Amino acid sequence: MGHEEALRNVPLFAGLEPSDLQRLGRILVPRQYEAGEVIINEGDEAVGFFVLSSGKVRVVKDLGGNREQILATLTPGEFFGETALLDGYPRTASVQAVDKTECLALTRWDFISELKGSPTMTVEIVRALARRLRQTDATLSE
């Protein structure tokens, strides 16, 4: 059966057909992380896309001099890791588990393949990126 039930509750996948959810459910890999464990390191090459299925993570930017800025706290149903997969540049921030966390991971190859084959998913990714850009603009103008 895979992870289709969990995927139905993820806004990114809400508009997908049941057959698309089944396919995604078969290729997503569950990954568990303990509190404090780093999932993505800023500056690393992008190898995956993650959907948060349980727990909580924080997205952190290194400001240098042993300082950091928390950019976001993500909860189940949200996703991360897409930016570096799309633009091919290194990761722009680190992602760390706040508490015991499970993510469903999609490899770079599968992520790109899904975007090419699913206009609905592509549009939802673009919408999510636009929302994040709008939030960043609002934060910077405060």
Describe the function of each predicted region.
Residues 1-142:
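Cytosolic regulatory regions built on CNB/CRP/Popeye-like sensor folds
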